[in-house]
């Protein structure tokens, strides 16, 4: 494994987690060492780069090869202890020296192609983001000097398969992975990078002309929208646990309608004013159900049963048995009220709707008729 010059771990929930480096750092290092091999005409087995964040990486080189004025080298991606679809794959650079004075950068096998607006790259270009483009070109220019030129191709033979485990297809990046990384370093389980990837999907939807968006916690919500609402899932964006953040991003981007769709296990937290729904931040599901059941006049016996439940599903069984299923419409209205309270200082707040569904894809409740909401979404 490559030696890192940033050994200090990141601590999460009492665990020491190892940092890693981005595909952008891999591509930069591969391009730099390939160019150096052309110039020196001998194989190099280790290369160092300075990342945009100022961290020095000393990385092992794999599959080095020289043929005249062209060289190929690979760096193995190491995501550290982060959950990363590209971890362990090889990122290659093929560099050909010329006398043009210009550096050209292209994406080859396994590097995605941009097919939609909104990711900050021209349509049809390789999915190599701006910061990696700059670091690759700077590293090559430093090696070859001001007069020479070079053609640089970044490729990743496993890229197309690995990309199926990423958000790329939803972002309109097809055929492979993206070469990304603004700092060059992967921070284990970085919440900010996760939120940013979700927000990017919102930006792409807005750039495509959509003005109404459906925010769901995960894949189950998207399936419900498709099967039970009959609405094009192009309008669906995953918000994960970051409800407040994604609502604020939707407002920033100018969406006129936000529809929150999900299972009560996630969405009822919003009725209590909880806008980060991960259980390690806040729970209060049973407390919220008990409070609103009490407001609807539920008997003490039901309140006690629900309060003692460990799961929302178990609580829902008691609610159904006692005939209080109308609580879900009440909760949906409360969710919308809480969202509007959060956005009370927004100059032009969007319309907010909420739909709750069961694990077997049945509608439990909504703030207004679901057919009415679906019709507006299809406009």
Curated annotation (Swiss-Prot):
E.C. number(s) listed in UniProt: 2.1.1.195
Signal peptide: none
Family: Belongs to the CbiD family.
Entry keywords, A to Z: Cobalamin biosynthesis, Methyltransferase, S-adenosyl-L-methionine, Transferase
Pathway(s) of this molecule: Cofactor biosynthesis; adenosylcobalamin biosynthesis; cob(II)yrinate a,c-diamide from sirohydrochlorin (anaerobic route): step 6/10
Presence of keyword Signal: no
GO molecular function term, any single one: cobalt-precorrin-5B C1-methyltransferase activity
Enzyme class: transferase
Protein name stated in the entry: Cobalt-precorrin-5B C(1)-methyltransferase
Keyword hit for Transferase: yes
Catalysed reactions, as listed in the record: Co-precorrin-5B + S-adenosyl-L-methionine = Co-precorrin-6A + S-adenosyl-L-homocysteine
A GO BP annotation: anaerobic cobalamin biosynthetic process
